[in-house]
């Protein structure tokens, strides 16, 4: 009985058919499946590239800093990156100093460019809705701090702006040098009986009040009720950067400066040769 069953099974055409004929071919892998399968290989290549670049960077930075490579054979990756950042910053400062020594306008151009970039970032952050408020505040604060440091930068050999005294204005043609001082108030009282300063003819005004107020050399002379006179200096007289020389009058009616000079001590100045700041 078992022999008959074995013979029937062996003679069956289905049993004689190979199993590979009934199997379907493999489906092509999708893009996501291909990425998953190739991810370990890509990660291995990426790490190999990073290690190779860090090894070259280590050699370059040790040569640039003139350090013995045998003593720094076991530098960590973070140490290599920190040393590289410091070296690049020093190079940037050296290049900036060299550029400023050859062209002083480089600093102004750098400030203008940084200010323009800062304004563009501020404009973008004010219109972008997806930026976190804390991140926006920190970024703008960092840019403002950098802008303050850039504004404090000076040329090589130039003192700090806060410690630098303003240069004295150039003296007038043929006139003595005077130390700069704050301009006097617009209304300067003069004792009574004072004569108008030389160099200008009186110009009468049309109104009755203008008869009393006359203009001498660009300054309006206004008589006071107590018998004194006052010079009314126009605002345009202080528009220039030249120094203003005060004029004092004595009781004798002659105009004298802070240091009185007798007529015999030097040649008298004519109206054309006298320097007037409002004519610059």
From Swiss-Prot:
Keyword Coiled coil: no
Bias kind Polar residues: ranges: 254-271
GO BP, sorted A to Z: forebrain radial glial cell differentiation; negative regulation of DNA-templated transcription; negative regulation of forebrain neuron differentiation; negative regulation of glial cell proliferation; negative regulation of neuron differentiation; negative regulation of oligodendrocyte differentiation; negative regulation of pro-B cell differentiation; negative regulation of transcription by RNA polymerase II
Orange domain location: 110-143
Compositional bias ranges of the Basic and acidic residues kind: 26-35
bHLH domain residues: 34-91
Keywords (A to Z) from UniProt: DNA-binding, Nucleus, Repressor, Transcription, Transcription regulation
InterPro entries linked: bHLH_dom, HES_HEY, HLH_DNA-bd_sf, Orange_dom
Localisation: Nucleus
Compositionally skewed regions (Pro residues) per UniProt: 164-174, 181-200
Gene Ontology terms: cellular component: nucleus
Pfam families: Hairy_orange, HLH
GO molecular function terms listed in the Swiss-Prot or TrEMBL record: DNA-binding transcription repressor activity, RNA polymerase II-specific; E-box binding; N-box binding; protein homodimerization activity; sequence-specific DNA binding
Region (Disordered): 1-44, 157-200, 254-280
Amino acid composition bias (Low complexity), ranges on this chain: 10-21
Main location: nucleus
Motif WRPW motif: where in chain: 275-278
Domain remark text: Has a particular type of basic domain (presence of a helix-interrupting proline) that binds to the N-box (CACNAG), rather than the canonical E-box (CANNTG). The C-terminal WRPW motif is a transcriptional repression domain necessary for the interaction with Groucho/TLE family members, transcriptional corepressors recruited to specific target DNA by Hairy-related proteins.
Function field: Transcriptional repressor of genes that require a bHLH protein for their transcription. May act as a negative regulator of myogenesis by inhibiting the functions of MYOD1 and ASH1. Binds DNA on N-box motifs: 5'-CACNAG-3' with high affinity and on E-box motifs: 5'-CANNTG-3' with low affinity. May play a role in a functional FA core complex response to DNA cross-link damage, being required for the stability and nuclear localization of FA core complex proteins, as well as for FANCD2 monoubiquitination in response to DNA damage.
Subunit structure: Transcription repression requires formation of a complex with a corepressor protein of the Groucho/TLE family. Interacts with SIRT1. Interacts (via WPRW motif) with TLE1, and more weakly with TLE2. Interacts with HES6. Interacts with an FA complex, composed of FANCA, FANCF, FANCG and FANCL, but not of FANCC, nor FANCE.
The name this protein goes by in its record: Transcription factor HES-1
Organism (species): Bos taurus (Bovine)
Lineage summary: Eukaryota, Metazoa, Chordata, Craniata, Vertebrata
């Amino acid at each position: 009985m078992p022999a008959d069953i074995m013979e029937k099974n062996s003679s069956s055409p289905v049993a004689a058919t190979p199993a590979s004929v009934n199997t379907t071919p493999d489906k092509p892998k999708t893009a996501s499946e291909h990425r998953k399968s190739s991810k370990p290989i890509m990660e291995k290549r990426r790490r190999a590239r990073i290690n190779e670049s860090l090894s070259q960077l280590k050699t370059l930075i040790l040569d640039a800093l003139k350090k013995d490579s045998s003593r720094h054979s076991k530098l960590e990756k973070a140490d290599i990156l920190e040393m590289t950042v410091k070296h690049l910053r020093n190079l940037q400062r050296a290049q900036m100093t060299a550029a400023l020594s050859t062209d002083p306008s480089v600093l102004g151009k750098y400030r203008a460019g940084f200010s323009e970039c800062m304004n563009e970032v501020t404009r973008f952050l004010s219109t972008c809705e997806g930026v976190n408020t804390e991140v926006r505040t920190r970024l703008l604060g960092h840019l403002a701090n950098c802008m303050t440091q850039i504004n404090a930068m000076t040329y090589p050999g130039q003192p700090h702006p806060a410690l630098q005294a303003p240069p004295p204005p150039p003296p007038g043609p043929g006139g003595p040098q005077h130390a700069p001082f704050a301009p006097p108030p617009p209304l300067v009282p003069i004792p009574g009986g004072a004569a108008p300063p030389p160099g200008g003819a009186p110009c009468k005004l049309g109104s009755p009040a203008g008869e009393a107020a006359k203009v001498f050399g660009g300054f309006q002379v206004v008589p006071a009720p107590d018998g004194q006179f006052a010079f009314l200096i126009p605002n345009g007289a202080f528009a220039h950067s030249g120094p203003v020389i005060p004029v004092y009058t004595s009781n004798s009616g002659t105009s004298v400066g802070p240091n009185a000079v007798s007529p015999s001590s030097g040649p008298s100045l004519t109206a054309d040769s006298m320097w007037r700041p409002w004519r610059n």
